[in-house]
């Protein structure tokens, strides 16, 4: 009897997690197209908000290096802002961040254009910045 319950328990757990992620991502999708925080200092280019945490291994070993490599090839006016959710919990709540890492791409007006939950490669983020209005070098 116990052996029969294990697959059911596993299936219920997986289903519950899938539902949680769907609800979370659905809530964040509502933010696309909205301005939640005015662009800093008259920004002329898109920017990235990078939500991280002290204990987030993937944040430190993969996402941060990908963002640094991306930043090295970007125009100096593109801002990548690293936000520790323990230091700025209100900002994390405003953007409905529930998983780390999360990167949010904003256009020059501060409007949310893309939200990435989990690791986002430099290539993906560069494409999202271009879609948000970053000029492409000729």
Locate each region found by the language model.
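Thiol-based oxidoreductase modules, predominantly thioredoxin-like and allied folds used
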Residues: 75-89
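Membrane-interface amphipathic/juxtamembrane segments adjacent to transmembrane helices
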Residues: 30-45
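Short active-site neighborhood of thiol/selenol oxidoreductases, capturing the structured segment around
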Residues: 42-55
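The canonical Cys-X-X-Cys-His
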Residues: 56-60, 103
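N-terminal targeting signals for export/organelle localization
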Residues: 1-34
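Typically the conserved alpha-helix immediately C-terminal to a functionally engaged Cys/Sec
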Residues: 60-74
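Non-catalytic, surface beta->alpha helical segment in thiol-disulfide oxidoreductase systems
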Residues: 105-138
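Structural micro-motif
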Residues: 96-104
């Amino acid at each position: 009897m116990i052996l029969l319950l294990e697959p059911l328990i596993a299936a219920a757990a997986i289903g519950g997690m899938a539902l949680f992620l769907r609800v979370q991502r659905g809530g964040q999708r509502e933010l696309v197209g909205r301005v939640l925080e005015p662009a800093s200092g008259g920004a002329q280019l898109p920017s990235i908000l990078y939500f991280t945490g002290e204990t987030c291994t993937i944040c430190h070993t993969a996402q941060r290096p990908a963002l640094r490599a991306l930043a090295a090839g970007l125009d100096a006016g593109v801002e990548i802002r690293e936000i520790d959710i323990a230091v700025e919990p209100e900002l994390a709540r405003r953007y409905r961040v529930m998983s780390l890492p999360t990167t949010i791409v904003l256009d020059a007006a501060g409007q949310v254009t893309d939200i990435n939950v989990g690791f986002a490669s430099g290539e993906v983020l560069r494409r999202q910045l271009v879609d948000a209005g970053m000029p492409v070098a000729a």
